[in-house]
Amino acid sequence: MAPKFSVVVPVYNEASFIPKALPALVAEMESLGDAYEVIIVENGSSDDSAQAARDAAVDAPVEVQSLDSADYGNAMYQGFKASKGEWVVNFDIDYFSADFLRRVVALEDVDLVIGSKRDPGSEDRRPLIRRIATRVFNLLLRTILRSRVSDTHGMKAFSRALIDDLNDEVVSRQDLFDTELVIRAERAGYRIVEVPVVVEEMRSA
């Protein structure tokens, strides 16, 4: 039986951080009580990120992939392609939330759930320069591409049907992969819901 959640986490040169973060992510997933898999996609690291993930994932449903070159978008693409879950989730190694997934399963008739930093009720506790950069990027996105989505980065949960339909259609890689995937989903008429989140990355917490 397919797991409820496939959590895809790209990592790059995170060997020192993974021993803290990956067990915390596993604990968050265990708190949900649903079957899950975590797919760590190490991409082009010069350290031992992949081995650190294997060591930190003992007795947990964690798969570790390694790619030759550093490419965040390709890491997401490959992780999504390998996923089996009903919901395919994009988390970062320093930014994840079981509460976000509880919101996902509480929704009905939806294909993409975005944890939007711009949604009313959200709290963005990141450094000011990062908050400004996010606002500028999303303003350009809405202006140039006429998107109604307020935030294409951060936590996202995609339905199995959406991933099976659109993952192979995305041509962008690096930091624009998920942006293109969200825009394609919007233009294809998939049902998108944005929910509030609290953004406080573990490194700065």
Q: Can you name each region flagged by the protein language model?
A:
Residues 42-51:
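A conserved acidic beta->alpha catalytic loop
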Residues 43, 89-94:
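Active-site acidic Asp-centered loop
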Residues 7, 11-12, 41-43:
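Conserved sequence signature across two-component system core domains
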Residues 14-17, 45, 72:
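Donor nucleotide-sugar binding loop of glycosyltransferases
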Residues 67-82, 87-90, 98-175, 201-205:
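Acceptor/aglycone-binding surface of glycosyltransferases and processive sugar-polymer synthases
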Residues 4-6, 37, 180:
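Cell-envelope/extracellular polymer assembly enzymes that use nucleotide-activated donors
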Residues 14-29:
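Short, well-formed alpha-helical segments that are part of the catalytic scaffolds
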Residues 147, 170-173, 182-200:
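Catalytic donor-sugar/metal-binding loop of nucleotide-sugar-dependent glycosyltransferases
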